[in-house]
């Protein structure tokens, strides 16, 4: 059944919001400029979807840091939404794929943060094809992304990977935000979200693919 308060959202409306954020992000983080057209193409694909996107109240800032494991199971914390977003946007119904994308991005960070900490040049072009640590990080990420999507499908009755274009667009929107954040706060970490943007705009066909 539908989640409480669910309502349809226009895909073109979502895509327009993503594009506006992309333009602003490219101004703040010029490293994004070479990817703007490819990212916008993903957004445009969502804008052209024939059916509305089901939306309801979501967490809005879901990632591994918002989870707490207890003896009674997992708890989800902090339902205030994205800290940088205005309050009216945090309260607005949104696609649950936003929260799924947040978790998938979090798996990337969990793997590649460790890699980058041990090898600052891990993402250098001359290293990506031969680095065993990078290969293991990608494999770990792919395995955990798939496990999360499998579990989500069992509990929610909807496999996020069946919403590939929408999920990929939400992942890109999150990664674009991360590039700006890292540019301002931790420049050495910019390769983490930037590598995901490269993957997500290079013909990935599955929301769970880690490339």
What residue ranges belong to the model's regions?
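Acidic, metal-ion-coordinating active-site neighborhood of RNase H-like domains
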Residues: 63
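A conserved short helix in the protein kinase C-lobe
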Residues: 105-108
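Long alpha-helical scaffolds in large eukaryotic adaptor/regulatory proteins
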Residues: 111-114, 183
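Short acidic alpha-helical/loop segments enriched in Asp/Glu that coordinate divalent cations
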Residues: 113-123
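ATP-dependent phospho-/nucleotidyl transfer catalytic cores
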Residues: 1-60, 70-76, 82-93, 97, ...
């Amino acid at each position: 059944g539908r989640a409480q308060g669910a309502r349809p959202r226009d895909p073109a409306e979502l895509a327009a919001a993503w594009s506006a954020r992309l333009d602003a992000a490219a101004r703040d983080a010029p490293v994004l400029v070479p990817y703007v057209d490819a990212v916008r193409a993903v957004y445009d694909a969502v804008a052209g979807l024939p059916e509305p996107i089901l939306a309801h109240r979501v967490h809005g800032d879901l990632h591994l840091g918002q989870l707490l494991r207890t003896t009674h199971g997992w708890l989800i914390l902090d339902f205030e939404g994205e800290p940088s977003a205005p309050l009216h946007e945090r309260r607005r119904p949104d696609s649950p794929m936003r929260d799924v994308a947040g978790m998938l991005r979090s798996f990337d960070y969990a793997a590649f943060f460790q890699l980058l900490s041990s090898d600052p040049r891990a993402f250098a072009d001359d290293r990506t094809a031969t680095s065993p640590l990078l290969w293991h990080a990608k494999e770990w990420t792919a395995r955990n992304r798939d496990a999360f999507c499998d579990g989500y499908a069992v509990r929610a009755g909807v496999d996020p990977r069946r919403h590939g274009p929408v999920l990929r667009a939400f992942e890109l929107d999150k990664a674009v935000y991360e590039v700006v954040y890292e540019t301002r706060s931790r420049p050495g970490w910019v390769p983490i979200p930037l590598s995901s943007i490269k993957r997500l705009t290079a013909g990935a066909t599955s929301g769970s693919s880690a490339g």
